[in-house]
């Protein structure tokens, strides 16, 4: 009878492990630090461990709301622009996002992701939010992530001269150091266009993140 109990107990722990490994991951860092690039290599690493993941971003919903305006007024598609055009409309996006957040004490954009996150978790897919930026309100993006047993990865990037890419605006400057201080992982990587090289370079960090997933 005791042996049977131990078998059941071990089986229970096994299923708990399977359930808890499917959690939410957030990536934070200033603009141009490589958050989407890091997501791509993290996704590849998790796939090698037989874990599915999918990118989510608060900014995608923001772009959906603003895109018709920017295309009409500036001939800029927020989902396709880069370089000069992206920097041109960035202040507009920041201001619009801030207005929505101020009206809801930080909950507007997180509420947009709630259903998407739930659907992914039901399918055993790990949601990875690539633009966690705010820790101002009680229920802000960081608190939302943690309320879901999430882990936060802070990313920064070195330039060729050894300096770190600075915040792009006042909003980033006010939040980035705070988010770095509470992040579960803080990673600083080199500027490099070779994602395969970055993948090999980040192996230790990727293993640490994977181990943390298994512990939660």
Task: Give the positions of each predicted feature.
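Hydrophobic anchor at the beta1->P-loop junction of P-loop NTPases
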Residues: 27
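Post-Walker A helix-loop "phosphate-sensing" segment adjacent to the P-loop in P-loop NTPases
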Residues: 44-54
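Conserved lysine of the Walker
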Residues: 35
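Hydrophobic positions on the alpha1 helix immediately C-terminal to the Walker A/P-loop
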Residues: 38
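P-loop (Walker A) phosphate-binding loop of NTP-binding proteins
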Residues: 30
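ATP-dependent small-molecule kinase phosphotransfer cores
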Residues: 58-125
